[in-house]
Amino acid sequence: MKHRGLGSSLLSALVAGAALLSVQTAFAQNDDRPPPLNTASAVKPPATPAAQVGKLTLDNQVKWLRAAQQSGTLEKLSDAQLVALFQSLDPLALPRYFKEGPNGYPSYEFTMSRSERIRGVWPEQPDHMLVRVAHNPLRIYAKWLPDGAHAGQEIIYDESKRSDQTYGHLGGIMNVMPLWTSLTGALARSQSNHSVRDLGTEYVVQQYLSEGRKYTEAGLPRSTQIEVKTIDGVRVVAFTFETPVGQPEFYAKKETLGLDLRHPFFRSIESYDNDGRLFEQIVFENITPKTFDDSTFDPKNKDYQF
């Protein structure tokens, strides 16, 4: 995620005096850093109507997005309102919104569907995975579910123990042979173009921001198409970005990223190569904050098959 600031002039510098005073008052309760995603927050809906947000300063557009996300205002907007809103924003507003985050939880569990083109071959069936992630230190448990490719596989990564290796088994009859493997070794690359460390919502946001910096540094325009989609029952705002240069300078020639309406992260990623072929498709399904103990990342856990 897959999945990117944008380089362009601001749509407006300052709004008129009286309007600016009212906007600043409306956002006074939202001037602090965003709270963690799993922290209860009673943020008031922003006072400025969605149709007028494009007239605000860049800073206040970002604050409006944050307040609208946390208060539930974004998800209440119609499809047409969402498209018009994001079309009206300063090109730097969305990157700033993501940069301020938070782009994930301190620890959380999610299920995901993932397909990647490996050595030119698109898989017949996507991976369906259950993933548990904790930070500081980064620890990951992943299991490939029965209804997807590579069913039965399990891996554990703990950067506090072996930062360059994972412990896992291939599933099926091979699950009696767990072994340590390199994060970037042949076995890991046979199933994914990514490291296990890339699992999670945070990586996709950082990829998006990194790609955006490339556009700015190269002085290239970043064309954007905006639409609203429902993916696996989740309504998202889908942004399609296409670069005139393509790979290898950029991660993808074209990408479509689906923005979650309640959190500053992406729920879906589609990436296309220079020939227009889809080479990566990821959907984060259920994302749930959870607190884990050490047994979650211990291969001796009785619920695991190591």
Give names to the regions the model predicted:
Residues 29-128, 304-306:
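N-terminal cleavable signal peptides for secretion/export
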Residues 121, 150-158, 176-181, 249-251, ...:
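A short, polar/proline- and glycine-enriched secondary-structure boundary/capping micro-motif
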Residues 24-28:
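Sec/Tat signal peptide C-region and signal peptidase I cleavage site
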Residues 12-22:
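Bacterial N-terminal signal peptides
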Residues 89-175:
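N-terminal mature ectodomain segment of secretory-pathway/periplasmic proteins
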Residues 2-13:
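Bacterial N-terminal signal peptides that target proteins for export
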Residues 31-38, 45, 50, 145-147, ...:
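Gly/Pro-enriched, hydrophobic low-complexity segments
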Residues 173-191:
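An internal, short helix-loop-strand segment that often contains or flanks glycine-aspartate motifs
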